[in-house]
């Protein structure tokens, strides 16, 4: 028993690293970065005003081959309700993930015990590689109300990105997240305004969405989808350094 008291338990991730997967951009997005940049693309954030996933986002998800899977954390309850689900996709559609704390708890479980986390997604066959994780939509997350509101939620986003980075290192999966553009928050009855009061010291918004700049700066590429004359157009907000 004395021997057991001195035994230390270490996470498996301390000893195992996975081969990294990279995001394959669909044709309509490939003109935004060079081939060399695309070959290093692990973190992508998409800003678009549609509730439903755009065609480009669906193409990004529908890129699995063989024994690969993509985990879709369906905060908006859109993906899992589609009549034709994405091939090779696993869906996490739980009330526990509609607040940022619950989302972080689930992702930490995915890091510490992937099989236990995936069982919550009704997965019973684990003979596959997790190619990527999609989180749609960060703008719908509920946040804690407190006198230190801004500090709390900013720190939660920093924690969110930290666990996403750890998952990429451990599982090799790429990360795609989505949010609404800034002007969308002033939409119907201003329903999304109050909870998005994270202040910036400079008073200047660096990105056309109301996520913390510290989170956005962690992305390899940020794409902004606009509709001009009835047609979708994509432009790059940030990309990998040359």
Swiss-Prot record:
Q: Which GO terms are recorded in the biological process aspect for this UniProt protein?
A: DNA recombinase assembly; error-free postreplication DNA repair; error-free translesion synthesis; positive regulation of single-strand break repair via homologous recombination; recombinational repair
**What's an example GO cellular component term for this entry?**
nucleus
Q: Where in the cell is it found?
A: Nucleus
Name the domain of life. Answer: Eukaryota
InterPro entries assigned to the protein according to its UniProt record, in alphabetical order: P-loop_NTPase, Psy3
Q: Which UniProt keywords apply?
A: DNA damage, DNA repair, Nucleus
Functional summary from the UniProt entry: Required for resistance to the DNA-damaging agents methyl methanesulfonate (MMS), cisplatin and oxaliplatin, but not to mitomycin C. Plays a role in protection against mutation accumulation. May be a component of the recombination-repair pathway.
Q: State whether it acts alone or in a complex, and with which partners, per the record.
A: Component of the SHU complex composed of at least CSM2, PSY3, SHU1 and SHU2.
Another remark in the UniProt entry says:
Present with 876 molecules/cell in log phase SD medium.
Q: What is this protein called in UniProt? A: Platinum sensitivity protein 3
Source organism per entry reads Saccharomyces cerevisiae (strain ATCC 204508 / S288c)
């Amino acid at each position: 028993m004395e021997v057991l008291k001195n035994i230390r338990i270490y996470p498996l991730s301390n000893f195992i690293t996975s081969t990294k997967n990279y995001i394959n951009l669909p044709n309509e997005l490939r003109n935004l970065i060079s081939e060399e940049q695309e070959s290093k693309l692990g973190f992508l954030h998409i800003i678009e005003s549609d509730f439903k996933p755009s065609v480009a986002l669906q193409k990004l998800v529908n890129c699995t081959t063989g024994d690969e899977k993509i985990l879709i954390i369906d905060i908006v309850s859109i993906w899992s309700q589609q009549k034709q689900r994405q091939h090779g996709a696993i869906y996490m559609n739980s009330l526990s993930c509609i607040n940022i704390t619950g989302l972080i708890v689930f992702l930490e479980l995915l890091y510490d015990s992937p099989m236990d986390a995936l069982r919550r997604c009704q997965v019973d066959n684990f003979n596959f590689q997790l190619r990527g994780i999609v989180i749609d939509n960060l703008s719908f997350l509920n946040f804690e109300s407190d006198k230190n509101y801004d500090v709390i939620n900013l720190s939660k986003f920093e924690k969110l990105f930290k666990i996403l980075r750890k998952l990429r290192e451990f599982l090799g999966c790429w990360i795609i997240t989505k949010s609404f553009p800034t002007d969308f928050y002033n939409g119907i009855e201003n329903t999304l305004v109050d909870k998005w009061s994270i202040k910036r010291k400079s008073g200047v918004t660096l990105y056309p969405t109301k996520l913390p700049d510290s989170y956005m700066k962690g992305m390899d590429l940020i794409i902004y989808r606009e509709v001009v004359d009835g047609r979708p157009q994509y432009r790059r907000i940030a990309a990998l350094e040359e």
